[in-house]
């Protein structure tokens, strides 16, 4: 191989310095908390809420259509003016699900609250003074959290 050239030897400290700088940046990034964590907020939309439950807002969450991730259970909300509350609850469940068929099953009614379940997906509508508030819950705690939804 031979003796390294002088030019090669001059660039070695620069390469080592660049490696040290990039290593320091990477190490600092790994040690510091992620400042881009999604904010946490109370699960409430329109006239529907789950008292005492605060979850991380999902990417794409807006004031008009908030979204939360509650330890693997996703919650979506929307306010819509509708005439037929039962039909609208079925349509909302279908829209949040993966199928195209209209969901069957009985809608549970409790005052202004309607609940329809299909596996790990639950749709809830709550009538308020204005538009009807809809919530969808999907995931391992969907049924449990659906029981906690109340009129705000």
Annotate each predicted stretch with a short phrase.
Residues 1-73, 138-152:
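N-terminal targeting sequences that direct proteins away from the cytosol to non-cytosolic compartments
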Residues 57-134, 138-145, 150-152:
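Conserved polar/disulfide-associated segments of primarily extracytoplasmic proteins
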């Amino acid at each position: 191989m031979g003796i390294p050239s002088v030019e090669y030897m001059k660039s070695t400290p620069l390469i080592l310095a660049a490696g040290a700088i990039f290593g320091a940046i990477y190490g600092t990034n790994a040690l510091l908390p992620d400042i881009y964590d999604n904010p946490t907020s109370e699960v409430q939309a329109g006239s529907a809420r789950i008292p005492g439950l605060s979850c991380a807002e999902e990417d794409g969450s807006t004031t008009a259509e908030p979204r939360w991730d509650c330890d693997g259970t996703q919650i979506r909300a929307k306010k819509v003016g509708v005439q037929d509350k039962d039909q609208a609850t079925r349509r909302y469940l279908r829209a949040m699900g993966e199928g195209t068929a209209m969901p069957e099953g009985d809608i549970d009614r409790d005052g202004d609250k309607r609940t329809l379940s299909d596996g790990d997906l639950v749709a809830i509508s709550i009538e308020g003074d204005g538009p009807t508030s809809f919530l969808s819950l999907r995931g391992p705690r969907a049924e449990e959290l659906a029981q906690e939804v109340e009129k705000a």
